[in-house]
């Protein structure tokens, strides 16, 4: 689940 949040942060 945390991976999803991390991926979104990387896109930003």
From Swiss-Prot:
Tissue specificity: Nacreous layer of shell.
Record protein name field: Uncharacterized protein IMPP8
Organism in which the protein naturally occurs: Nautilus macromphalus
């Amino acid at each position: 689940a945390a991976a999803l949040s991390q991926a979104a942060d990387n896109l930003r």
